[in-house]
From Swiss-Prot:
A motif (DEAD box) lies at residues 367-370. Its EC number is 3.6.4.13. CDD domains: DEADc_DDX3_DDX4, SF2_C_DEAD. This is ATP-dependent RNA helicase DED1. The lineage of its organism: Eukaryota, Fungi, Dikarya, Ascomycota, Pezizomycotina. The gene is DED1.
Length: 694
């Protein structure tokens, strides 16, 4: 009936163009104003007449009927006048003839789209190229990326000078850290490694041999010899052992875990990502190495280091952290991920979204592990390590690095480690002798402001990092400095990630040489050329002080640390501060020495080595010692003087006995004339004191 339908002069038969020889089924609908007209070729873009076919495309079905190139453009992008062809890397297959005229950009032929293959890894001929299904994330052998050849051996990609300058900088680049005048003194730093069958330390990066492609990047980074922590950690990790490494700040801990992990990863190709099934399904990343850090700034810094040493390799480091746009991070993961650097919160979020699987993890690294395992992060760490598909500790290597490992954190960390080696590098207290430490007594904020202005106005060289306790104080102090025409900026947890990154960039480049920060910037940040650290507000824990001042005096460079000490607010760390200064051969002010003795007398100092009382301290020097050998506890013992300090606390046994209440050397305060002492039941407390069940 429809075929005979006639509405006025319009027939439905006229609305259908007959099917052509290359079409199937019903042909296209013809609007009324074009019915009965003769088909003509389309006009050119300038309206001057029929479009001409593009040279080189005459064999296509659409070229004769489509417009030519846009005025001013080359015939196609590969043959344009401003196009510079790139050479194909050795061993890479040639592209199809249509792509190999004057350029070799096409390293593999395009595939037909199949909705059911979305997200799957490509076949061998596509892997390592932009056509491969998501693993390598870049064109094969182009842009500073390597690839895996058909035999599964790693092939180094070509040089990319622009990327090289971005990653490694120039020889005199002020934004990059270079070794200082005291770097050679690192060889004299004492090292203690405990555990059975500890591998011998190395003296050069080539023994045991790191992968040659990693070594070339180490040379570009101008690293000549390994630091003490690297001399021990590289053979330990390459030997398959778990590690807890305690090393002074600025001693190369990041390289201590990155170098062996990347070297091992370059010897053996990791597993491919699981294929996503069905149209629109999202690909899941399967990293083989996971590095966790407590702050966004620290993981960003580790990621930058990983990018540097993955240059011209097929390894792809990625970073995920909160406060940044998630979409971009997900797109980066879709391009492939071998090494994942993350903060715990964002990682858990992405795991719950099904975008990251930890099933193939071979290496788990906790940087600044003492903070990662404290009460704030412990639930998230357990969710990641014990509540996911991550292999258990017997099927992976676990590495922990920090400047301090208090005894309670060491006990907790043993849940995640297997038969680990404890590495202690540096002096007791974990501060560097490269740092000159000064303590200034300031009771009020007005006194601190005056002293701060005197310091900043008299020393205008290098970068100055000022630590305060609260976010509000950070903003107020930076405004105060700006009012006095001093270029300052602030960084703290209430600032957006973009603002924090901007502040760090201004500080790193020296355009704003004074940075006021809360503890968010204290842990692990490696900012080159920081010459002065000022503790406007001292922290409550001596371990936090160690981490703060470690932002200067890095990689053998010298630095200055100034702390404003308030008797009313900082009295409880006086004893620990005195011991720390003495251990680092620093001058101890008279007022602080007197306060330290008072702290011993009343047992108010927060834990330490034998000579300190205190409540629930952290064992003093045992923060850098293996509790399996030295013992330790929450108090660390008492004063051992003429009056009892009643310090100490519940702790592990020391070397002197199996059940000591004091841990280390010292028990409940030392008592009268040396009594009530001893590290364990029945051990004498001193040369004249009798045995005591205390």
């Amino acid at each position: 009936m429809a075929n005979g339908l006639n509405i006025g002069s319009l027939k439905i038969d006229d609305s259908q163009r007959p099917a052509g020889p290359n079409t199937t089924g019903r042909a296209a609908y013809i609007p009324p104003h074009l019915r009965g007209s003769v088909a003509r070729p389309p006009m050119g873009l300038d309206g001057s007449g029929p479009a001409q076919a593009v040279p080189g495309l005459n064999a296509s079905t659409w070229a004769p009927n489509n417009a030519g190139p846009h005025p001013g453009a080359g015939h196609n992008w590969a043959n344009a006048q401003n196009f510079t062809p790139r050479d194909r890397p050795p061993g890479a297959p040639a592209g199809p003839p249509s792509m190999n005229g004057n350029t070799t950009w096409g390293n593999a032929p395009p595939r037909q789209f199949n909705a059911n293959d979305y997200g799957k890894p490509g076949p061998n001929s596509f892997r390592g190229s932009s056509y491969g299904g998501g693993r390598s994330g870049g064109t094969r052998g182009i842009g500073g990326h390597g690839y895996w050849d058909e035999n599964g051996k790693h092939a180094q990609g070509p040089e990319n000078k622009r990327l090289e300058r971005e990653l490694f900088g120039e020889a005199d680049d002020p934004t990059k850290q270079h070794t200082g005048i005291n770097f050679s003194n690192y060889d004299s730093i004492p090292v203690e490694a405990s555990g059975h069958d500890v591998p011998e330390s190395i003296t050069a990066f080539t023994n045991p041999p790191l992968h040659e492609h990693l070594l070339s990047n180490i040379v570009l980074a101008r690293y000549t010899v390994p630091t003490p922590v690297q001399k021990y950690s590289i053979p330990i990790v390459m030997g398959g052992r778990d590690l807890m490494a305690c090393a002074q700040t600025g001693s190369g801990k990041t390289g201590g875990f990155l170098f062996p992990i990347l070297s091992q990863s370059l010897h053996t190709r990791g597993p491919e990502a699981e294929a996503a099934r069905g149209l629109g399904r999202q690909q899941k990343a399967y990293p083989t190495a996971l590095i966790l850090g407590p702050t966004r700034e620290l993981v960003s810094q580790i990621y930058d280091e990983a990018r540097k040493f993955c240059y011209r390799t097929a390894l792809h480091p990625r970073v995920v952290y909160g406060g940044a746009e998630m979409g971009n991070q997900l797109r980066q993961l879709d391009q492939g991920c071998n090494v994942l650097v993350a903060t715990p919160g964002r990682l858990v979020d992405m795991m719950e979204r099904g975008r990251i699987s930890l099933a193939h993890i071979q290496y788990l690294v906790l940087d600044e592990a003492d903070r990662m395992l404290d009460m704030g992060f412990e639930p998230q760490i357990r969710r990641i390590v014990q509540g996911s598909d991550m292999p258990d500790k017997h099927m992976r290597q676990t590495l922990m690095f920090s400047a301090t490992f208090p005894p309670d954190i060491q006990k907790l960390a043993e849940e995640f480690l297997k038969d680990h080696i404890f590495l202690s590098v540096g002096r007791v207290g974990s501060t560097s002798e490269n740092i000159t430490q000064r303590i200034v007594e300031c009771e009020s904020d007005k006194d601190k402001d005056s002293a701060l202005l005197d310091i900043l106005c008299s020393d205008s060289t290098g970068l100055t990092l000022v630590f305060v306790e609260t976010k509000r104080q950070a903003d107020m102090l930076s405004d105060f400095l700006l009012d006095h025409r001093l270029p300052a900026t602030a960084i703290h947890g209430d600032r957006t990630q973009r603002e924090r990154e901007r502040a760090l960039e201004l500080f790193r480049t020296g355009r704003c040489p004074i940075l006021v920060a809360t503890a968010v910037a204290a842990r692990g940040l490696d900012i080159p050329n920081v010459t002065h650290v000022i503790n406007y507000d001292l922290p409550n824990e001596i371990d936090d002080y160690v981490h703060r001042i470690g932002r200067t005096g890095r990689a053998g460079n010298t630095g200055i640390s100034t702390a404003f000490f308030s008797r009313s607010k900082n009295f409880k760390i006086a004893r620990s501060l005195v011991d720390l200064l003495k251990d680092a051969n620093q001058e101890v002010p008279d007022f602080l020495e007197k306060l330290g003795r008072q702290g011993n007398y009343y047992g108010s100092s927060g834990g330490g080595r034998g000579g300190r009382g205190g409540g629930r301290g952290r064992g003093g020097s045992s923060s850098t010692r293996d509790i399996r050998r030295t013992g330790g506890g929450y108090g660390g013992g008492g004063m051992g003087g003429s009056r009892p300090a009643y310090g100490g606390g519940y702790g592990d046994s020391g070397a002197g006995g199996p059940y000591g209440y004091g841990g280390g050397s010292g028990g409940y305060g030392g008592g009268y004339g040396g009594g009530y002492g001893g590290g364990g039941y029945g051990n004498p407390s001193g040369p004249t004191g009798p045995s005591s069940w205390w």
